[in-house]
């Protein structure tokens, strides 16, 4: 399965609860934190929801 590298570059503070939940679901905790997740429709949806807080690359 394909994987993608997701890096948080903006803070999740003072954001909508659903956006904070998406960051938590992706496993992101702080600025410059990077995780490698599988490229599934559910993770794509979480990334699209918080696309202004994260940057995505293929892993």
Curated annotation (Swiss-Prot):
Lineage, top-rank taxon, reads: Bacteria
Gene Ontology biological process terms, A to Z? translation
- What CDD domains does its record include? Ribosomal_L30
Q: Does the keyword Ribosomal protein apply?
A: yes
Q: Which Pfam families match?
A: Ribosomal_L30
Under the heading InterPro entries, the entry gives: Ribo_uL30_ferredoxin-like_sf (IPR036919), Ribosomal_uL30_bac-type (IPR005996), Ribosomal_uL30_CS (IPR018038), Ribosomal_uL30_ferredoxin-like (IPR016082)
Q: Which UniProt keywords apply?
A: Ribonucleoprotein, Ribosomal protein
> HAMAP family given for it?
Ribosomal_uL30_B
Q: How does this polypeptide assemble, per the annotation? A: Part of the 50S ribosomal subunit.
UniProt family annotation? Belongs to the universal ribosomal protein uL30 family.
| Stated name of the protein | Large ribosomal subunit protein uL30
What gene is behind this protein? rpmD
